[in-house]
């Protein structure tokens, strides 16, 4: 009897060893295959690449850290090459960035991203980018299109040679062509990433609705004591904040960005010292893409966001500059009263006013399409219903007015900043930089130092943006836009 038991144990042990060996062999084989496939998909960064769209020869040298130094004879080739090289290094990141900002993640990752897509479709960053294309002309539009053409040259090459980054193979899709709108949408996303005051207004509204006035004031004591009328009005409205925003994505606050500039009068070298330390969201790969761009009349080094041409912070032969977030309140929630007989009409100045309804149907991986409409009042998109799943439309909603949803041309400013030779040219370039509002520090070879908080900020009629305001009253909030100017030496 004992012999039989021992034989069974030995047989079981052998089966376990064989099974473990097979599993281990499969794991090792898969790892080897994945490694070989990944290496095969790596872009060519040595030797000569022939691209039909280039007008003249371009040199791309990568330093010991892999940073590309691009030198060309003309603007088209410079930005075309920047787009091509960025796509070599960051195409998957670029594609996910435009998809997230556009509300198109579900198409490649499935239903888990639907609520996130609804949020970004509702906000309308891509709609704002599409409206901004008309703000660009001349050299700026030429640079944007050249950059997009460079990205597309790499996409076509990678598809043809079956060398797309391995992430595309894992997710089972190929990237669509790049466009100017994609670049501008990523720019608008940065305003989202660096903003987020509306959720504070929503929380204060909830506190006033659910807590005694004294306790609510303890949570935001800066609220003016002599403004009881607004509090009373809010008490008589009803937006379910907890339900409306339970699925929202609020950018994490990594507070503490800093930049500073010191006059040469106070430095050992006699030259200005400039330092810049912007704290943005942690990401892998980094949100920043470092590069150097050189052609006649331009020699600029620094960083930019993947998917965007130029350099957002850095230096050229004459000047250096840094950027951090100013963080002003540029968002306002409006309390909109819906017509009980027509869900697409809202009260304004004692009349029912028809809202715009935009079809933002969401494609989901696997072929499914989810119908989704975005309602836009005169103030902005209705954002308090994006996560509702088939619920009856509420009588009162929040709409969002936000400077980033206006047409603007920040990348025109960036490209002109890159070429600026002194403070006057740099400040002139900033006239096109509207959102997000940023702190710019500046230093030049001639010893000039300057600081300017630059961007569009709402001028509120009552001087306070801590709470939502009634959308049905004419000019209840907003008297225009203020542009900030600060010290210069």
Q: For each predicted feature, which ranges?
A:
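Substrate-recognition/specificity elements adjacent to catalytic centers across diverse enzyme folds
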Residues: 3, 34-273, 278, 306
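N-terminal type II signal-anchor transmembrane helix
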Residues: 8-51
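Alpha/propeptide regions of enzymes that mature by internal proteolysis
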Residues: 60, 410, 414-432
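Short helix/loop capping segments that flank catalytic or ligand/cofactor-binding pockets
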Residues: 71, 79-80, 270-271, 282-285, ...
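Sec-exported extracytoplasmic/periplasmic mature domains
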Residues: 152-160, 419, 431-438
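Short active-site loop/helix that positions an aromatic residue
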Residues: 280-293, 424-433
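Compact, glycine/acidic-enriched structural inserts
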Residues: 299-300, 305-370
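Hydrophobic alpha-helical segments
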Residues: 435-489
